[in-house]
Amino acid sequence: QEVTEIKKEASSDFELVFADGSQVEAKTVIYAAGATPRRANIPGEQEYAGKGVSYCAICDGSFYRGKSVAVLGGGDTALDDAVYLADVAEKVYVIHRRKEFRGAAVTVAKLREKENVIFVLEHQVKEIIGEQKVTGVVLEDAAVIDVNGVFVAYGAVPQTDLLKKFAVLDDSGYVRAGETGETALEGLYVAGDARTKKLRQVVTAVSDGANAATAVAEYLK
């Protein structure tokens, strides 16, 4: 069932409220609600998800070795993805609606040194097109860029609303926690993409789960 509320008084156990109104008590909670990638919300994005549209360069970049890809975005997520993809793909188009990037200047400088990175600035993608798989993107001026893959790199939204009242979140909404998953609130642990960390992949989420479970077992002894 879906948990709709987490309650905890100063010295009490946690109280979890479910969507159907039922409740359970627990001495510890491992929170693993993850994070949701921000969407571009343009035609073709949903249609070609998994068929050329991706939200994780490290996860899917190897499928585009020797091919052309587009990276959408202007923040650190987009810049880091472009750096990674530049070592894999034949061409990397970085498409950003502004003239300047929000991400780190040092990463922009690194990208400018790469001959296979093409900046398409002050433009937005209005549609992702294809034939069973992605074949290109259409800009707002109707220009078409032929690519085999599109990486939507607008960052992610952590699913941490249930924890806001416990003051355990960083400025971006992720749960502050170390490698064991332990937070500043006694008994609350976090695992997966909702935790503050650099790399978010299936393998790191699994590792987080194992670490948090081990820490909880020790805590409950």
What does each of the following model-derived ranges do?
Residues 1-18, 23-26, 87-179, 218-221:
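A Rossmann-like FAD-binding core segment of flavoenzymes
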Residues 78:
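N-terminal Rossmann-fold NAD(P) dinucleotide-binding loop
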Residues 65-67, 122, 185:
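Phosphate-coordination loops involved in phosphoryl transfer and adenosine-cofactor binding
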Residues 73-75:
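Glycine-rich Rossmann-fold phosphate-binding loop(s) that bind the pyrophosphate
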Residues 41, 46-63, 154-204, 208-211, ...:
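FAD-site-proximal beta/loop scaffold in flavoenzymes
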